[in-house]
UniProtKB/Swiss-Prot annotation:
PANTHER family: CRP FAMILY TRANSCRIPTIONAL REGULATORY PROTEIN, FUMARATE AND NITRATE REDUCTION REGULATORY PROTEIN. Binds 1 [4Fe-4S] cluster per subunit. It comes from Pasteurella multocida (strain Pm70). Keywords: 4Fe-4S, Activator, Cytoplasm, DNA-binding, Iron, Iron-sulfur, Metal-binding, Repressor, Transcription, Transcription regulation. This is Anaerobic regulatory protein.
Amino acid sequence: MILFEIDQFYIIFVVLIKVLFMDTKIGRKVQSGGCAIHCQDCSISQLCIPFTLNEQELDQLDNIIERKKPIQKSQVLFKAGDPLNSLYAIRSGTIKTYTISETGEEQITSFQLPGDLVGFDAIMNMQHPSFAQALETSMVCEIPFDILDDLSGKMPKLRQQIMRLMSNEIKNDQEMILLLSKMNAEERLAAFIYNLSRRYSARGFSAREFRLTMTRGDIGNYLGLTVETISRLLGRLQKMGILSVQGKYITINDMVALIELSGTTKTNIKMGI
């Protein structure tokens, strides 16, 4: 009887030790709701903050990141006027950012894909000037800004990567202005589709076949065109043999023609959309 109790105690002790060991080894997984993917294992890390960091620096960054539960479609990540507490790195899904005018009109400012960071525009006033909303079920990594700012002061590579990402966002804004001011409706839509293709390709997805996660209304809002114009232009591109369109699914049949139509070769547009 005594031996049986000792054996039971030993088994319980071993189990507890294993649990404690696992908590120490993968403590971040426990804190983040069981998420097993970390910066070192993330397939899109080359597009995000971890790019160029060594293993020790990655561990320091990884320790401050919170992996949030899935954000459901239409759920808002933050609202205009919210204080800047964190930046958000998109792991999967699509997030749109937008502002709302005094008259209540929505203006979409970007569509963010996996590897993109959301929230940079809040740094100047430490307050979000825009909204961020999921267009589909999405996963994000939440990065506390104060801690990230402190870490970047100690890690030159991290600071350089943040500056590179911010510079890219400024470049995208400039190219968006050029897109809206210099291109006609057909060129705008062609540039939009081509750059989605390019961005999906950079993330390891097909450059020729993909699903539009945004509605035609969203695309029109972003490009300054009506829904009817978007539908008409998609039909025209399909008749020209450049695209095949089935609902939200796009197949690019003639990439060269799409690039030429987008005016990319003339204006060198490489917007991040």
